[in-house]
């Protein structure tokens, strides 16, 4: 982790720097906020800024963001003046570290803010095969395309590959191609010279140069404009880039990783992605299975997130109840690991008893998780779905959806909660669908007695 310290290195701040270095940080130093912005602009990469709270933190953050240099900031200061600490947080600092420093606090803050040491939590055989392949190709210089649904952990996998590579001690730089406007992405990747365009007040080093010697991750590369893909292809082939407004090519030594949640082969057919670029990137493909295809990972991930967020919130770590585990495994998790992480974060905060009960685990819409269906009910619903699928040819999507919901509900004996769980939708969504069908005159199976059966 690269730490840029901003402020005068005297007394307690110097001690804090030594503690950060002992915690594994690679530390560099400037005295003023202007020097900090200039250092970032010149390509001195940083994962975190530690800034003395007597300096203009708001101005520093504004100056950096004006040039799209979004590096998290933690404030620090002697005597822990409450007003100054509050103002630093209000200005945009993620955390405040009081000085004299505490070694454990500094290590915890560095880990929490940068969050770049996410381990690979793997128990399921499907994911173990992916890890095995990643371990094989990580030491090479091959470009790797990491594919999978949104939230399945593609960036975590990219960091894992970098950590296992021969470039592990060099920078890992990530660019989200979907989050940066098309007209700015070229400058973000390749940098620009002073005066290259309106607002280019100074030379800016791009991500390719910042990653020199290390790894560059092109996140969601499928969202990149076709015109820019041509320039990217040349940079990958020639290992040199042209800054916007520059006259001389710049050599770079990097390894390229890329991620996508779209089918790039189909994008090639649609004309939105270059076939030659796909071949360059897809030397090795690591496909991350969605969470629903690796159920053995669910509880291990849950326990990891409980530990993480209990520590982050100063809450005693609790075990997960047996019923909660059953529901967690049965849920389909359309948002994958990201959705599961958010659910467990909420559960840590909402749990009131000695265990994390099933009622503390809430879905994104605030609804509790549905009970796990018993085997007989699940098998009956599957048979209903199989039988229905044979009659779906020639029907509209809405008609297919309606028939599937009605058939599943019938085989769940009217139990709304069980049916919603099998269908992979929330109970609220199911009830809204059933009301819509009833209003249209469709016969809806009545609810039966028992927990979760009420309409």
Curated annotation (Swiss-Prot):
Family matches, as InterPro entries: AAA+_ATPase (IPR003593), CheY-like_superfamily (IPR011006), Homeodomain-like_sf (IPR009057), HTH_Fis (IPR002197), P-loop_NTPase (IPR027417), Sig_transdc_resp-reg_receiver (IPR001789), Sigma_54_int (IPR002078), Sigma_54_int_dom_ATP-bd_1 (IPR025662)
Every Sigma-54 factor interaction domain range: 120-349
Function recorded in the entry: Activation of sigma-54-dependent flagellar gene promoters and strong negative autoregulatory effects on its own promoter. The synthesis and function of FlbD in C.crescentus is controlled by an internal cell-cycle clock.
Predominant location category: cytoplasm
PANTHER family in alphabetical order: TRANSCRIPTIONAL REGULATORY PROTEIN, TRANSCRIPTIONAL REGULATORY PROTEIN FLGR
Residues in the DNA-binding region annotation: 416-435
Any Pfam family matching the protein: Sigma54_activat
Name by which UniProt lists this protein: Transcriptional regulatory protein FlbD
Keyword list, A-Z: Activator, ATP-binding, Bacterial flagellum biogenesis, Cytoplasm, DNA-binding, Nucleotide-binding, Phosphoprotein, Transcription, Transcription regulation, Two-component regulatory system
Gene this protein is translated from: flbD
Subcellular location: Cytoplasm
Amino acids binding ATP: 148-155, 211-220
GO biological process, one term: regulation of DNA-templated transcription
Miscellaneous information on this protein: FldB is transcribed during a very brief time in the cell cycle just before the periodic expression of FlbG and its other target genes.
Residue ranges occupied by any Response regulatory domain in the UniProt entry: 2-114
Source domain of life: Bacteria
Classification via PROSITE patterns: RESPONSE_REGULATORY (PS50110), SIGMA54_INTERACT_1 (PS00675), SIGMA54_INTERACT_2 (PS00676), SIGMA54_INTERACT_3 (PS00688), SIGMA54_INTERACT_4 (PS50045)
A single MF term (Gene Ontology): ATP binding
One GO cellular component, as annotated: cytoplasm
């Amino acid at each position: 982790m690269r730490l840029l310290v901003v402020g005068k290195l005297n007394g307690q701040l110097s001690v804090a720097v030594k503690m950060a270095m002992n915690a594994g940080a690679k530390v560099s130093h400037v005295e003023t906020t202007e020097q900090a912005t200039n250092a970032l602009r010149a390509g001195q990469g940083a994962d975190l800024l530690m800034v003395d709270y007597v300096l203009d933190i708001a101005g520093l953050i504004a100056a950096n963001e004006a040039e799209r240099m979004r590096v998290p900031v933690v404030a620090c200061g002697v005597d822990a003046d409450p007003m100054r600490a509050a103002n630093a947080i209000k200005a945009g600092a993620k955390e405040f570290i009081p000085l004299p420093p505490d070694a454990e606090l500094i290590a915890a803050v560095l880990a929490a803010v940068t969050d770049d040491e996410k381990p690979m939590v793997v128990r399921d055989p499907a994911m173990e095969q992916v890890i095995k392949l990643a371990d094989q190709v990580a030491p090479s210089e091959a470009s790797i395309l990491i594919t999978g649904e949104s939230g399945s952990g593609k960036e975590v996998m990219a960091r894992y590959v970098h950590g296992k590579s021969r470039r592990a001690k060099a920078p890992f730089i990530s660019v989200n191609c979907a989050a940066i406007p098309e007209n700015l992405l070229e400058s973000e990747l390749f940098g620009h010279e002073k005066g290259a365009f309106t607002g280019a007040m100074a030379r800016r080093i791009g991500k390719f140069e910042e990653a020199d010697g290390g790894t560059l991750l092109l996140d969601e590369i499928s969202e990149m404009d076709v015109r820019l893909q041509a320039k990217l292809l040349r940079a990958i082939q020639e290992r040199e880039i042209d800054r916007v407004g520059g006259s001389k090519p710049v050599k770079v030594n990097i390894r390229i990783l890329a991620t996508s949640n779209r089918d790039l082969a189909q994008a090639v057919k649609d004309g939105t992605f270059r076939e030659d670029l796909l071949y360059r990137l897809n030397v090795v493909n690591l496909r991350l299975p969605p969470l629903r295809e690796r159920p053995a990972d669910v509880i291990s991930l849950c326990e990891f997130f409980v530990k993480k967020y209990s520590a982050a919130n100063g809450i005693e770590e609790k075990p997960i109840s047996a019923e909660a585990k059953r529901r967690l495994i049965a849920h389909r998790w359309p948002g994958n690991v990201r959705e599961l992480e958010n659910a467990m974060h909420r559960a840590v905060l909402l749990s009131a008893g000695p265990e994390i009960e099933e009622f503390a685990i809430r879905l994104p819409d605030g609804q509790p998780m549905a009970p796990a269906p018993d085997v007989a009910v699940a098998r009956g619903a599957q048979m209903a779905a199989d039988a229905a699928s044979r009659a779906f040819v020639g029907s509209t999507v809405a008609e297919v959806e309606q028939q599937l919901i009605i058939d599943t509900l019938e085989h769940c004996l009217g139990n709304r909660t069980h049916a919603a769980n099998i269908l992979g939708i929330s109970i609220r969504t199911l009830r809204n669908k059933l009301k819509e069908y009833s209003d249209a005159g469709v016969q809806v199976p009545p609810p039966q007695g028992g927990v979760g059966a009420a309409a």
